[in-house]
Amino acid sequence: VRGLVDSNPIPGLRGLLKIPSSQSKAVLTADQIRAFYRALRAYRGYPETALCLRLIAFTACRPGEAADAEWSEFDAEGKLWRRPAAKMKARRDHVSPLSEPVLKLLEELRPITGAGRYLFPHRSGEGFTTPNRLTYAMRDMNLGERTTPHCWRTTFSTWANEQGFRPDAIERQLAHVESNRVRATYNKALLLNERREIMQAWADHLAALAHAGSTSDAAN
Protein backbone atom coordinates (compact mmCIF):
# COMPACT_ATOMS: atom_id res chain seq x y z
CA VAL A 1 0.00 0.00 0.00
CA ARG A 2 1.39 3.38 -0.97
CA GLY A 3 2.45 5.77 1.78
CA LEU A 4 3.19 3.23 4.53
CA VAL A 5 6.99 3.18 4.13
CA ASP A 6 9.47 5.84 3.09
CA SER A 7 11.64 3.54 0.96
CA ASN A 8 11.67 0.19 -0.76
CA PRO A 9 13.15 -2.41 1.66
CA ILE A 10 13.81 -5.03 -1.04
CA PRO A 11 17.25 -3.79 -2.20
CA GLY A 12 18.55 -4.12 1.35
CA LEU A 13 17.56 -7.78 1.40
CA ARG A 14 19.45 -8.69 -1.73
CA GLY A 15 22.19 -11.19 -0.95
CA LEU A 16 20.48 -12.23 2.29
CA LEU A 17 17.75 -14.34 0.74
CA LYS A 18 18.75 -17.39 -1.26
CA ILE A 19 16.59 -18.27 -4.21
CA PRO A 20 16.29 -22.04 -4.76
CA SER A 21 18.15 -23.04 -7.90
CA SER A 22 16.31 -25.01 -10.53
CA GLN A 23 19.74 -26.32 -11.55
CA SER A 24 20.43 -28.09 -8.23
CA LYS A 25 22.03 -31.46 -8.79
CA ALA A 26 20.66 -34.75 -7.57
CA VAL A 27 22.38 -36.81 -4.90
CA LEU A 28 22.89 -40.37 -6.10
CA THR A 29 21.42 -43.05 -3.87
CA ALA A 30 23.23 -46.27 -2.99
CA ASP A 31 21.03 -48.13 -5.48
CA GLN A 32 21.89 -45.62 -8.21
CA ILE A 33 25.61 -45.98 -7.51
CA ARG A 34 25.31 -49.77 -7.76
CA ALA A 35 23.41 -49.32 -11.03
CA PHE A 36 26.13 -46.96 -12.28
CA TYR A 37 28.81 -49.61 -11.81
CA ARG A 38 26.62 -52.31 -13.32
CA ALA A 39 26.19 -50.06 -16.35
CA LEU A 40 29.96 -49.55 -16.55
CA ARG A 41 30.52 -53.30 -16.58
CA ALA A 42 28.07 -53.59 -19.48
CA TYR A 43 29.36 -50.47 -21.29
CA ARG A 44 30.39 -51.12 -24.90
CA GLY A 45 31.35 -47.60 -25.91
CA TYR A 46 34.79 -46.01 -25.96
CA PRO A 47 36.79 -47.18 -22.91
CA GLU A 48 38.06 -43.64 -22.34
CA THR A 49 34.49 -42.46 -21.69
CA ALA A 50 33.92 -45.07 -19.00
CA LEU A 51 37.30 -44.30 -17.44
CA CYS A 52 36.54 -40.57 -17.41
CA LEU A 53 33.25 -41.18 -15.61
CA ARG A 54 35.10 -43.30 -13.06
CA LEU A 55 37.67 -40.54 -12.55
CA ILE A 56 34.89 -38.02 -11.88
CA ALA A 57 33.24 -40.39 -9.42
CA PHE A 58 36.47 -41.04 -7.50
CA THR A 59 37.71 -37.43 -7.38
CA ALA A 60 34.42 -35.45 -7.28
CA CYS A 61 35.96 -33.03 -9.78
CA ARG A 62 33.92 -30.96 -12.18
CA PRO A 63 33.19 -32.82 -15.44
CA GLY A 64 35.01 -30.16 -17.45
CA GLU A 65 38.13 -30.57 -15.32
CA ALA A 66 38.21 -34.29 -16.07
CA ALA A 67 37.45 -33.79 -19.76
CA ASP A 68 40.49 -31.57 -20.37
CA ALA A 69 42.84 -33.25 -17.87
CA GLU A 70 46.42 -33.52 -19.11
CA TRP A 71 48.95 -36.21 -18.29
CA SER A 72 51.44 -33.55 -17.17
CA GLU A 73 49.08 -32.58 -14.32
CA PHE A 74 49.36 -35.97 -12.62
CA ASP A 75 52.11 -36.89 -10.18
CA ALA A 76 51.81 -40.65 -9.70
CA GLU A 77 54.72 -40.80 -7.26
CA GLY A 78 53.33 -38.02 -5.09
CA LYS A 79 49.76 -39.25 -5.67
CA LEU A 80 48.59 -35.77 -6.65
CA TRP A 81 46.60 -34.09 -9.40
CA ARG A 82 47.73 -30.47 -9.88
CA ARG A 83 45.24 -28.35 -11.80
CA PRO A 84 46.38 -24.87 -12.90
CA ALA A 85 44.34 -21.80 -12.03
CA ALA A 86 43.50 -21.15 -15.69
CA LYS A 87 41.43 -24.35 -15.74
CA MET A 88 39.65 -23.84 -12.44
CA LYS A 89 36.30 -22.15 -11.91
CA ALA A 90 37.71 -20.25 -8.91
CA ARG A 91 40.79 -19.24 -10.93
CA ARG A 92 43.27 -20.57 -8.39
CA ASP A 93 45.58 -23.58 -8.51
CA HIS A 94 44.10 -26.74 -7.08
CA VAL A 95 45.92 -29.81 -5.79
CA SER A 96 43.91 -32.97 -5.26
CA PRO A 97 45.17 -36.15 -3.54
CA LEU A 98 44.68 -39.34 -5.53
CA SER A 99 43.32 -42.50 -3.95
CA GLU A 100 44.72 -45.92 -4.82
CA PRO A 101 41.88 -46.76 -7.27
CA VAL A 102 42.61 -43.57 -9.21
CA LEU A 103 46.26 -44.55 -9.55
CA LYS A 104 45.14 -47.93 -10.91
CA LEU A 105 42.75 -46.16 -13.28
CA LEU A 106 45.63 -44.07 -14.64
CA GLU A 107 47.68 -47.23 -15.18
CA GLU A 108 44.76 -48.71 -17.10
CA LEU A 109 44.35 -45.58 -19.21
CA ARG A 110 48.02 -44.90 -19.98
CA PRO A 111 48.39 -47.57 -22.72
CA ILE A 112 45.33 -46.08 -24.44
CA THR A 113 46.05 -42.34 -24.40
CA GLY A 114 49.36 -41.95 -22.55
CA ALA A 115 51.29 -41.03 -25.69
CA GLY A 116 49.24 -37.87 -26.14
CA ARG A 117 48.62 -34.67 -24.20
CA TYR A 118 45.16 -35.36 -22.84
CA LEU A 119 43.86 -38.26 -20.77
CA PHE A 120 40.63 -38.16 -22.73
CA PRO A 121 41.32 -36.82 -26.24
CA HIS A 122 38.53 -35.97 -28.65
CA ARG A 123 37.73 -38.70 -31.13
CA SER A 124 38.63 -36.32 -33.95
CA GLY A 125 42.21 -36.35 -32.74
CA GLU A 126 42.15 -32.65 -31.91
CA GLY A 127 41.65 -31.34 -28.39
CA PHE A 128 39.88 -33.19 -25.62
CA THR A 129 36.53 -34.85 -25.08
CA THR A 130 33.49 -32.75 -24.14
CA PRO A 131 31.46 -32.77 -20.91
CA ASN A 132 28.37 -33.26 -23.09
CA ARG A 133 29.65 -36.64 -24.22
CA LEU A 134 30.00 -37.64 -20.57
CA THR A 135 26.50 -36.40 -19.77
CA TYR A 136 24.98 -38.39 -22.62
CA ALA A 137 26.87 -41.51 -21.58
CA MET A 138 25.66 -41.24 -18.00
CA ARG A 139 22.08 -40.51 -18.99
CA ASP A 140 22.12 -43.62 -21.18
CA MET A 141 22.58 -45.56 -17.95
CA ASN A 142 18.99 -44.69 -17.00
CA LEU A 143 19.87 -43.75 -13.44
CA GLY A 144 17.22 -41.04 -13.28
CA GLU A 145 16.13 -37.95 -15.17
CA ARG A 146 18.29 -35.48 -13.23
CA THR A 147 21.47 -37.54 -13.07
CA THR A 148 24.57 -36.08 -14.70
CA PRO A 149 28.30 -36.45 -14.02
CA HIS A 150 28.08 -33.35 -11.82
CA CYS A 151 25.92 -35.37 -9.41
CA TRP A 152 29.10 -37.00 -8.12
CA ARG A 153 30.10 -33.71 -6.50
CA THR A 154 26.87 -33.32 -4.55
CA THR A 155 26.87 -37.03 -3.73
CA PHE A 156 30.44 -36.89 -2.42
CA SER A 157 29.77 -33.72 -0.43
CA THR A 158 26.64 -35.19 1.16
CA TRP A 159 28.39 -38.45 2.04
CA ALA A 160 31.52 -36.77 3.45
CA ASN A 161 29.50 -34.42 5.65
CA GLU A 162 27.36 -37.30 6.89
CA GLN A 163 30.55 -39.19 7.79
CA GLY A 164 31.62 -36.31 10.01
CA PHE A 165 34.63 -35.12 8.04
CA ARG A 166 35.58 -31.47 8.53
CA PRO A 167 33.66 -29.10 6.23
CA ASP A 168 36.85 -27.09 5.56
CA ALA A 169 38.55 -30.16 4.10
CA ILE A 170 35.49 -31.16 2.09
CA GLU A 171 35.10 -27.69 0.59
CA ARG A 172 38.80 -27.55 -0.18
CA GLN A 173 38.56 -30.87 -2.00
CA LEU A 174 35.65 -29.54 -4.06
CA ALA A 175 37.69 -26.42 -4.90
CA HIS A 176 34.96 -24.19 -3.54
CA VAL A 177 35.80 -20.57 -2.74
CA GLU A 178 35.22 -19.47 0.85
CA SER A 179 32.63 -16.67 0.78
CA ASN A 180 33.81 -15.24 4.10
CA ARG A 181 36.85 -13.13 3.18
CA VAL A 182 38.39 -13.20 6.66
CA ARG A 183 37.95 -16.97 6.91
CA ALA A 184 39.36 -17.40 3.41
CA THR A 185 42.47 -15.40 4.33
CA TYR A 186 43.28 -17.70 7.23
CA ASN A 187 42.23 -20.94 5.54
CA LYS A 188 44.81 -21.32 2.78
CA ALA A 189 46.12 -24.66 4.02
CA LEU A 190 45.94 -27.46 1.48
CA LEU A 191 44.85 -29.96 4.17
CA LEU A 192 46.32 -32.69 1.97
CA ASN A 193 46.71 -35.39 4.62
CA GLU A 194 43.16 -34.89 5.82
CA ARG A 195 41.78 -34.82 2.29
CA ARG A 196 43.79 -37.91 1.34
CA GLU A 197 42.06 -39.78 4.16
CA ILE A 198 38.66 -38.54 2.97
CA MET A 199 39.24 -39.53 -0.65
CA GLN A 200 40.49 -43.00 0.24
CA ALA A 201 37.45 -43.53 2.47
CA TRP A 202 35.23 -42.33 -0.39
CA ALA A 203 36.94 -44.73 -2.80
CA ASP A 204 36.41 -47.58 -0.33
CA HIS A 205 32.75 -46.61 -0.04
CA LEU A 206 32.30 -46.68 -3.82
CA ALA A 207 34.15 -49.99 -4.08
CA ALA A 208 31.86 -51.57 -1.49
CA LEU A 209 28.78 -50.46 -3.41
CA ALA A 210 30.24 -51.49 -6.77
CA HIS A 211 31.12 -54.94 -5.52
CA ALA A 212 27.78 -55.53 -3.82
CA GLY A 213 26.45 -58.66 -5.44
CA SER A 214 29.28 -58.78 -7.97
CA THR A 215 32.83 -60.12 -8.17
CA SER A 216 33.79 -57.60 -10.85
CA ASP A 217 36.56 -55.12 -10.18
CA ALA A 218 34.84 -52.26 -12.03
CA ALA A 219 35.33 -49.88 -9.09
CA ASN A 220 39.05 -50.55 -8.98
State the predicted function of each range:
Residues S72-L80, G144-R146, F165-N187, A208-D217:
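Short, polar N-cap/turn motifs at the start of nucleic acid-interacting alpha helices
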Residues R38-A42, S72, E108-P111, D140, ...:
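Conserved helix-loop functional segments at active or binding sites
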